[in-house]
Amino acid sequence: MFVSLRSGTIRARKLYARLSVRWIFFLTLATVITTLSASWGFKALPVQAAEEKPFRIDALLQTPDWLTLSGEHRIRMSQLANQFRPTLDENDEALSLRTLLKAEATFGKIRFVGEMQDSRAFFTDENSAVSTAVVDSFELLQGYVNVRFDDIIGKGSTLDITGGRQTLDIGSRRLIGRNGHRNTIQAFTGLHAHWQGADRSELRLFTVLPVSTLPSDRESLLKNKSAFNEEDFDLRLWGVFYKRPNLFLGGAGEFYVYGLQEDDDPKERQTRNRALYTPGFRLIKNPKAGAWDFDIENTLQFGTRRATTAVTDSENLDVFAHFHHLEIGYTWQVPWSPRLDFEFDFASGETSTSDDDANRFDTLFGPRRSEFGPTGIFGILGRENIISPGLRLSAKPNARTDGFISWRANWLDEETDSFARSGVGDATGQSGSFGGHQIEGRVRYWLRKNSVRLEAGAALFIEGAFLKNAPAAAGNGDPLFFYSNVTFSF
């Protein structure tokens, strides 16, 4: 017992030393940047003071009216203790930098838009969880032409036609969305038509090629190497989305169907040859002080895919999967505007590997931070093989500050499939069905409104029977993750 205690103490000291060095570095860097920002006119005002004008680079450069320049730079330090992924280091860390630079040239109803992304990670090592979700250095994120037409199909309506490389935010963003928390952002190349009626109804039609992040090998990612991202016709995405306001109990209704077609590229990559069709609907009423709100989404998925990416695997499996989200909340009309909501997510898992069916839900290109916690080197939860009820309490003390705490209990839908995004599975189904509890919190503060924002968050995953007993479990104990970042908008 004493040997075990001493070993645990030594491990704790080593972890503390690693954390201390990194956090001292990060806090020092944040202090320097904050001091410099104050000297450049970013000085924070008291909450009660009048709203200050945000700093904007195009105002500084006095660009002509037709040209708009903007950007963002984010510095984030992340630490993960007790890694849940098998074969990776027990403790992980990353200093992530993300810079976005955007230029818009507007000539009447025509806009030309270009946006660059530079995402890098430091303090990572060979067994880090670094991936293309963290690193994508010096890349054209967006480059498109947008044309607007007024009074199309109704007076007061608008129609935007966008062609080129672009990011997409569709509906709830659970299936297709522009990443916010993640260090890299998914882009698409193609055509997108967006019609909006005078009554706030919407219709979207799009056909695009998802952009693949390059390079993707571990050595290149660890060295932050650059390569031009690519898209090709071996991976295609299309969709139809319609939104109608005031459809149900004062809330809006959304209806959609998305299609994804994927083929092998003999020279580049082998795939599961997915041919997926994902129809669904959503009912939503946004939070409002002194009122109830809700968010209900139901999605089916069918088509074909293969069990593996192996060249020898030529058998198509019949896909039938599904995902469901339920959220009911209430916001009190009192100081701090506290909101308490009940959340429930269900995403199907693989029922068997010995039949001709595939049942694990594919979340396509949907961000997961809003429901399932921080991603990056963390991100144990996702919309795959999960049954997850939870509670969330959020508050906004003032115009500069907001935060929340949340709890989720997480079960496997299928005991023989891997749990959510953990990478841990038990084909025998003998390790149980309870994945564990996740407790998470976050606070954000505008040091200067719409210019400098501070953010800190933490998540603790208390392992259940499955992650303790599964043969492939990492066995490092309860994962603990925390991060802090500073974001400059200009």
Q: Model regions: which residues?
A:
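N-terminal secretory signal peptides that target proteins for export/translocation
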Residues: 1-21
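N-terminal periplasmic/intermembrane-space "pro-region" immediately following the signal or transit peptide
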Residues: 2-5, 26-29, 33-92, 98-108, ...
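Structural signature of outer-membrane beta-barrel domains
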Residues: 76-80, 112-115, 119-123, 166-170, ...
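Surface-exposed loop and membrane-interface regions of Gram-negative outer-membrane beta-barrel proteins
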Residues: 83-97, 107-161, 174-177, 223-227, ...
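Signature for the C-terminal beta-barrel architecture of outer-membrane proteins
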Residues: 148-161, 178-354, 396-399, 407-411, ...
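Outer-membrane beta-barrel signature, preferentially recognizing the C-terminal barrel domain
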Residues: 233-239, 369-392, 396
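Flexible internal linker/loop segments at domain or repeat junctions
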Residues: 359-383, 414-429
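Predominantly the C-terminal beta-signal and adjacent terminal strand-loop region
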Residues: 447-489
